[in-house]
Amino acid sequence: MKRPVLLVSKCLGFAACRWNGQMIADDFVEALRPWVEFVPVCAEVEIGLGVPQEPVRIVRTPDGDRLMQPATGRDCTEAMRSFGDHFFRSAPSFDGALLKSRSPSCGIKDVKVYAGMERAPQVDKTAGVFAAALAAHRPDVPAEDEGRLTNAAIRDHFLRRVFCMARFKETAVAGNMADVIRFHAAHKMLLMTHSESAMRAMGRLVAAGGKHAPREVVEEYGRMLAAALARPPRKSATVNVLQHAFGYVSDRLSAAERSHFLSSLERYREERLPLSALLTLLQSWIARFSVSYLADQVLLQPYPAELDSVVDSGR
């Protein structure tokens, strides 16, 4: 498959464009470089704030939250909204967004809102103005900030969404129902860890595909896929899926191997072992016994194996 396309805040390793003229080195961004195509953007530079610049903040006013530059008194709200609207209307499609946390322009949800221009208390948290435009124009695009992505579960969820949606984008180009059916079959187990009911509804959609125009089915499937993947995978559902997969090979394993898997599953349930360890075990047995149905399941490797260690590291 082609590399997924990720929108990224330019200050995260691409240019020294922060308000203080600095660049931020981010390990996760660096690990992704071989596997994704980055589209860097700095919204604050694009609206002419310059580098370095006087800091901006979001200020709550009687007219709503405004993006203000206290040192100059400049109200940057409309300029940023205009840039965001134009950017997301004209930019090509992308598979995810990785933005700068707490930035008044790019923060996803943790941007401080102040009661006044200077020496004023924080009264709320919100999304940055550019990030809000992203959510309005591209609501199905997985979007995270580098702060939240220090969490292993959030990293895994983000990468699943990005790589799955990129795979579907390639599948959807031809609008061929046979390709969508194959896609759904390969993603069944992964989707079950997010929402079994959504997986079954998507299965009914493709099964009845002959009653509708193929393009309509493909578009509806894409919407359902994005909604299903937006739900974080549930541990209980993941354990059930792993047990189901284990059932395909368990009768051909030794007693010691079965015991090892079940004890590993319990350690995963207790958050003492990463999911990748169990998937690696299953992959080895699937290859050993040539279990073709399981070999095609994307859950076993939803993103490049080289990123497993990145996902498993940290908290």
For the regions a language model picked out, list residue spans one by one:
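N-terminal extension/subdomain marker
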Residues: M1-P4, A16-R18
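Short, hydrophobic/glycine-enriched beta-strand segments
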Residues: V5-L12
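Short beta-strand segments
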Residues: S9, C42, L98-R102
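N-terminal glycine-rich anion-binding loop in soluble enzyme alpha/beta folds
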Residues: A16-C17, G21-R66
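A charged helix-plus-loop insertion that forms the helical arch/lid used to bind
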Residues: R57-R74, K112-D124
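Glycine-rich anion/phosphate-binding loops
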Residues: T72-P92
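Internal, conserved structured core segments that host functional sites
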Residues: R89-T171
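Acidic, Ser/Pro/Thr-rich low-complexity regulatory regions
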Residues: P142-R315
